[in-house]
């Protein structure tokens, strides 16, 4: 039987490609796990990750932002009392239509005010949406203190981001 060098080269190339893909896929799952555990460090020093281990869609990064004409502007974790509108921006790991997202604004520590929920905003994603934001507007100055936004994905608490009004 005569071996053709072209077929031999093609077979070796195929074996190398398959070996690289297997190695790459194994490394991706490990790097995703390490990225998930570091998400709070990437997005802000004041966010925390509480998602279920088997979550298909999750918040990859989360940030608070100042208002810029009704849209999220500069990223921040500190507002002035006169900043009437605060935005929370969640970047999802992937776009999946029908993902239910809930933003829950809470008072953490404000002098003379009981801790608790301020408001809730719910949204269901459309196709190709992996960035979702919600905002909260107050008609008067914000009381100084600390606040947080909890972000739920499909009913499960995923991430929390803290901010202050100073």
Protein language model features and the residues they cover:
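Contiguous segments within soluble domain cores/interaction surfaces
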Residues: 51-144, 150-163
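Ser/Thr-rich, Proline-interspersed low-complexity disordered segments
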Residues: 20, 46-54
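Bacterial lipoprotein signal-peptidase II cleavage site
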Residues: 20-38
């Amino acid at each position: 039987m005569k071996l053709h060098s072209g077929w031999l080269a093609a077979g070796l190339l195929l074996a190398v490609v398959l070996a690289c893909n297997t190695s790459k896929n194994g490394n991706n799952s490990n790097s995703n796990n390490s990225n998930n555990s570091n998400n709070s460090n990437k997005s802000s020093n004041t966010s925390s990750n509480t998602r279920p281990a088997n979550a298909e869609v999750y918040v990859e990064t989360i940030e608070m932002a100042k208002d810029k004409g009704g849209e999220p502007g500069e990223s921040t974790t500190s507002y002035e009392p006169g900043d009437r509108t605060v935005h929370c921006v969640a970047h999802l790991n992937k776009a999946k239509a029908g993902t239910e997202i809930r933003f829950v604004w809470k008072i953490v520590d404000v002098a003379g005010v009981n801790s608790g929920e301020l408001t809730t905003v719910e949204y269901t994603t459309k196709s190709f949406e992996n960035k979702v934001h919600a905002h909260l507007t107050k008609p008067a100055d914000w009381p100084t203190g600390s606040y947080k936004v909890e972000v739920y994905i499909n009913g499960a608490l995923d991430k929390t981001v803290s901010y202050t009004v100073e």
